[in-house]
Amino acid sequence: MTPVVALVGRPNVGKSTLFNRLTRTRDALVADFPGLTRDRKYGHANIAGYDFIVIDTGGIDGTEEGVEEKMAEQSLLAIEEADVVLFLVDARAGLVPADIGIAQYLRQREKTTVVVANKTDGIDADSHCAEFYQLGLGEVEQIAAAQGRGVTQLIDQVLAPLGEQLNADQAVENEENSANEEADEWDTDFDFENEDDTALLDEALEEETEESIEDKNIKIAIVGRPNVGKSTLTNRILGEERVVVYDMPGTTRDSIYIPMERDGQQYTIIDTAGVRKRGKVNLAVEKFSVIKTLQAIQDANVVLLTIDAREGISDQDLSLLGFILNAGRSLVIVVNKWDGLSQDIKDQVKSELDRRLDFIDFARVHFISALHGSGVGNLFDSVKEAYACATQKNSTSMLTRILRMAADEHQPPLVNGRRVKLKYAHPGGYNPPIIVIHGNQVEKLADSYKRYLSNYFRKSLKIIGSPIRIQFQEGNNPFAGKKNKLTPSQLRKRKRLMKFIKKSKK
């Protein structure tokens, strides 16, 4: 399961700055769910090879009536959900009573807590941070979140002790990256025009991903806003009342994993808690965790994003969709409650979906009624199609041919007067499909050309329902950093030119 890291502390100690640094976004948001609690933000991060979910909370100000009684509820829930709590303090402001109160609360919760002294740039960090050892929470880590100094080392030290939970995630990533490393080693020795050489490379790449592809149990996560019919759809798929259904948002509090078999194929259906709007649910229902939904997305092979046809697509849906795409999961759009709508309303809903979801035209869209069962059976065809596309094996020779066809039809743009050269492509991973393109100056390719390549590969490989990721590897220049040694005649000529230039300036 993806680990969870919560950022807590007083106001203005740099929690949001660190959140932005970890999630690599400037809007403090990778998956924003306004209304879960007023100031909590969720994001997906990958630092030092570790995948994790990070929670940014509002500042805790307990200086007036005590932290124990006035701890902000969003921070309380974040602490409960987290595997590790990063307790941020301000190294410049020093230790204040609110820090002591927060530390006392954290010690009572017996959560893995790391004290992080932020804003250590431009000061004698060791002397300023010494007083934070009074908090009794162990070592004090020093960072400067605004500049990013110490952040990678912090995450490496914090997440490494989680052991097996993280090793499994890191092993999957290593499997995807190992193919890239092998191809880099063979770049100069292999002839990618030679079928025997490319066959050997493909065989090596297959060994890295064979185990994950051969897992035939397809995990399907059903996600969406509250009361869009997720549990009703789950029960309709299962053919029995396995999940409580009630016409009130927030009935499902946790992610429920249910195994099933259909036409000889093993599935695991994951019914998740809804992601609700601000002020739409009462305090008792607010205790369910959206973290479970985010983790279910990470754990799934295919995600069914369920939308209420009567309410249309909302910003909540788009936020959730962004998290699904960032996680690289296959996607099927399910528009529920389609029954009983007039043809004019149906046309209006379809037009709105086309307008707001034009950037995911690769995903199948199904219009169903989970209550009556119409259209539900067709979902499995799209699920199997998306999973097959996400895990299909492509040879190096095929990908290289497609790359050259794309370059022939639309040549890469000039960079500083030189044409970007695309050498070859090979598979770099599966679920989602990763294509690694090697060449010269590829890091300078315009985003528009990268999108062109992505769309060209998708069309050529007929990938439906799955995002596709393209990574670029710069070819090593053997002459980089080297200077030609001038001959004596060249040195004399250079001196004459320098003298001429100096005289001209006078």
Swiss-Prot record:
HAMAP family: GTPase_Der
Pfam families (UniProt xref): KH_dom-like (PF14714), MMR_HSR1 (PF01926)
Gene that specifies this protein: der
Name of the protein in its database record: GTPase Der
Domain KH-like: start-end pairs: 392-476
Gene Ontology annotations of biological process type: ribosome biogenesis
Keywords: GTP-binding, Nucleotide-binding, Repeat, Ribosome biogenesis
Function: GTPase that plays an essential role in the late steps of ribosome biogenesis.
PROSITE patterns assigned: G_ENGA (PS51712)
Organism annotation: Actinobacillus pleuropneumoniae serotype 7 (strain AP76)
Annotated SMART domains: AAA
Keyword flag Nucleus: no
Residues annotated as domain EngA-type G: 3-166, 218-391
Binding site for GTP 1: 9-16, 56-60, 118-121
Family the UniProt entry places it in: Belongs to the TRAFAC class TrmE-Era-EngA-EngB-Septin-like GTPase superfamily. EngA (Der) GTPase family.
Binding site for GTP 2: 224-231, 271-275, 336-339
GO molecular function, one term: GTP binding
Keyword Membrane set for record: no
Subunit-level organization: Associates with the 50S ribosomal subunit.
NCBIfam families for this protein: GTPase_EngA, small_GTP
